[in-house]
């Protein structure tokens, strides 16, 4: 009965047929040929102890999986025992089988599952065994409940393969940091998990990216997810359930047909320990320091021998990285002694004022330049900058100037902005310049005229209009951009209603790895997405609850989930919007309904 219930069907007929029709080596009169390539994966022929066995010995436990051909272990980490022990299972190839042993005793009266999905392949062609989960107990019964769900990245909402999903009967969050779970499993390529043969009791549900495979959460280096409330299994194990089958991950229909009870969004917590973790002098007058935790609190900062009014500093948006420049064109010493007075975490885990001296040595390239000028490039004596102006988005983002070093002199009013219409008529127009609030080296030029498709726009920068901290002036340049005028391009308009918070709205490409256009809104709005090529796109909307312009992460001990990120779903449940050529689409989105 146990064999029928727990052991997958073995294609005996196929094996017998292969044996009957295989030519005998003794009777052949011609040399053997290569023959067709073997594409059939290994098949289990024997399991010890039998699936569903009870009262399995705790001490020196051995499990044997016998196959119809010689096999090898492709990925030892995929031999996963639940509940996990302090040390991972050991394996040994034994004939056509795999012998699995454990370095420590199993617990008494406990149901175990050994999953071997993506672990075993045949010895010759590498055909992968589709997977199997062996269930056994050291007690006199087999636990019979199960839970299912999916794990995804909190920002991209892409499924995460290989996350460790954990169940704890200890409901204190500290358990995740201190001991291994009462049951666990790894997610597949769809981010899907099924923790089977567990007790009928109340659990905490977590997932982690277990970097060191110790089945314990380490917040400084690993990502985590948690379900907001306690859970109780409601589904009993039945080997006919789709959720318990082993599917080819390319079988989309079957994989999507599996029911998912819980959804976990995995995130990286902010480090709680504050200290300087990295520092580097990257140029004659440039250096940076980085902190372990965001929002570093700096009281004062100085470099020995450098007047305070010559020091320029800038934090990044998360305030965990600080750029430092010395505003002095003369040659600087080979070593800077940077002093930073900041709030540092002490041995008791408390923040205290601390002054740290950091030695910053000039990079070798700069030292070599002292004795040799022959390799000096033109850009090494110029005020270097770029102008970013993409045809598809320039009317929204403007012409973005970014300088390599901070400016000490500028004459933005000396620039020329002109445009040529389709009739080849040329006009000069006024413009505005705004310095970026987060990057003092970035400036945005916006014309005082609406930018139109098919028009050519020019920004001309004359010679010696900008001077940086090195004392270098700029070279002259001109950029040209033409707004797209292709009749085949399409437009998507989003009508967003019931906007009761601040939201970040992104249009992404099909792979979700490129933002086509982005908006930040805090009221009902109509957002245009013009100049779209035919293809599939998705709409990602992030709820910026604290209105800081950043997608804030979660906090496990505070039971705070990361700020919610959702993809707009069509009526059929898909997130991809198919946009044909020469189309104007309009979509209404009720944000209050979407984020309720």
Label for each model-derived stretch:
Residues 2-596:
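N-terminal targeting or signal-anchor segments and their processing/structural boundaries
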């Amino acid at each position: 009965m146990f064999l029928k219930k727990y052991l997958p069907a073995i294609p005996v007929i196929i094996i017998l047929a292969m044996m009957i029709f295989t030519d005998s080596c003794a009777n052949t009169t011609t040399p053997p040929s290569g023959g067709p390539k073997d594409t059939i994966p290994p098949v289990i022929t024997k399991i010890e102890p039998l699936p569903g066995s009870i009262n399995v010995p705790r001490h020196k436990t051995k499990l044997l999986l016998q196959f119809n051909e010689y096999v090898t272990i492709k990925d030892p980490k995929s031999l996963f025992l639940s509940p996990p022990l302090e040390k991972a299972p050991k394996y040994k190839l034994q004939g056509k089988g795999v012998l699995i042993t454990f370095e420590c005793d199993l617990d008494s009266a406990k149901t175990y599952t050994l999953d071997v999905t993506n672990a075993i392949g045949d010895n010759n062609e590498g055909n992968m065994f589709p997977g199997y989960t062996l269930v056994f107990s050291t007690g006199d019964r087999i636990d019979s409940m199960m839970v299912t769900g999916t794990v995804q990245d909190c920002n991209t909402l892409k499924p995460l393969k290989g996350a460790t999903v954990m169940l704890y009967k200890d409901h204190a969050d500290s358990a995740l940091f201190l001991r291994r779970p009462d049951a666990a499993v790894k997610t597949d390529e769809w981010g899907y998990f099924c923790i089977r043969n567990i007790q009928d009791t109340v659990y905490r549900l977590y997932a982690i990216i277990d970097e060191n495979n110790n089945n314990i959460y380490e917040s400084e280096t690993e990502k985590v997810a948690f379900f907001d409330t306690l859970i109780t299994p409601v589904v009993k194990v039945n080997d006919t359930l789709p959720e318990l089958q082993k599917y080819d991950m390319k079988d989309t229909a079957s994989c999507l047909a599996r029911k998912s009870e819980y959804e976990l969004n995995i995130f990286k917590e902010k480090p709680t320990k504050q200290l300087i973790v990295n520092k580097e002098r990257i140029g004659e007058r440039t250096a940076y320091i980085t902190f372990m935790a965001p929002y570093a609190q700096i009281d004062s900062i100085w470099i020995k021998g450098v007047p305070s009014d010559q020091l320029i500093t800038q934090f990044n948006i998360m305030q965990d990285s600080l750029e430092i420049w010395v505003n002095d064109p003369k040659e600087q010493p080979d070593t800077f002694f940077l002093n930073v007075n900041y709030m540092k975490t002490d041995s008791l885990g408390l923040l205290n004022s601390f002054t740290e001296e950091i030695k910053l040595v000039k990079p070798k390239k700069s030292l070599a330049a002292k004795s040799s000028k022959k390799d000096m490039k033109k850009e090494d004596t110029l005020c270097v900058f770029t102008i970013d102006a993409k045809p598809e988005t320039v009317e929204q983002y403007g012409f973005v100037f970014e300088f390599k070093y901070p400016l000490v002199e500028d004459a933005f009013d000396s620039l020329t902005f002109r445009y040529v219409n389709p009739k080849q008529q040329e006009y000069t127009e006024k413009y505005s310049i705004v310095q970026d609030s987060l990057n003092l080296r970035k400036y945005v030029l916006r014309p005082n005229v609406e930018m139109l498709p098919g028009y050519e726009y020019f920004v001309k920068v004359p010679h010696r209009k900008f001077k940086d901290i090195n004392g270098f002036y700029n070279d002259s340049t001109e950029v040209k951009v033409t707004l797209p005028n292709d009749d085949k391009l399409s437009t998507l308009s989003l009508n967003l209603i019931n906007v009761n918070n601040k939201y970040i709205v992104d249009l992404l490409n099909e792979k979700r790895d490129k933002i086509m256009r982005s908006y930040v809104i805090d009221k009902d709005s109509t957002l245009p997405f013009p100049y779209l090529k035919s293809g599939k796109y998705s709409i990602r909307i992030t709820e910026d609850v604290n209105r800081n312009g950043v997608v804030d992460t979660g906090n496990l001990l505070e039971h705070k989930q990361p700020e919610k990120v959702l993809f707009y779903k069509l009526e059929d449940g898909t997130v991809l919007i198919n946009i044909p050529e020469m189309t104007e689409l309009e979509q209404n989105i009720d944000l209050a309904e979407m984020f309720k």
